[in-house]
Curated annotation (Swiss-Prot):
Transmembrane segments: none annotated. One of its GO terms (molecular function) is structural constituent of ribosome. This is Large ribosomal subunit protein uL29. Keywords: Ribonucleoprotein, Ribosomal protein. The keyword Aminoacyl-tRNA synthetase does not apply. One of its GO terms (cellular component) is cytosolic large ribosomal subunit. One of its GO terms (biological process) is translation. Belongs to the universal ribosomal protein uL29 family. InterPro entries: Ribosomal_protein_uL29, Ribosomal_uL29, Ribosomal_uL29_CS, Ribosomal_uL29_sf. SUPFAM superfamilies: Ribosomal protein L29 (L29p). Coiled coil: none annotated. The keyword Ribosomal protein applies.
Length: 68
């Protein structure tokens, strides 16, 4: 992700409620699980997507802690 995309993503997250952030986190965790499964099976072409999703999960958790 480029810096502009990251800033847009974080700004979008800050506009969500706690419940919506939790839902977004669960969606990203499910995607990460699926990506890891594909990587283990040797079917994953975009290996960089694993790190990207992990960082997105961290961003969601950061925004959640900011709201508390």
């Amino acid at each position: 992700m480029k810096l502009e995309e990251i800033k847009k993503f974080v700004a979008e997250l800050r506009g969500l409620s706690q419940e919506e952030l939790a839902k977004k986190e669960n969606e990203l965790k499910k995607e990460l699980f699926d990506l890891r499964f594909q990587a283990a099976a040797g079917q994953l072409d975009q290996t960089a997507r694993l790190n990207e999703v992990k960082k997105q999960i961290a961003r969601v958790k950061t925004v959640q802690s900011e709201m508390k």
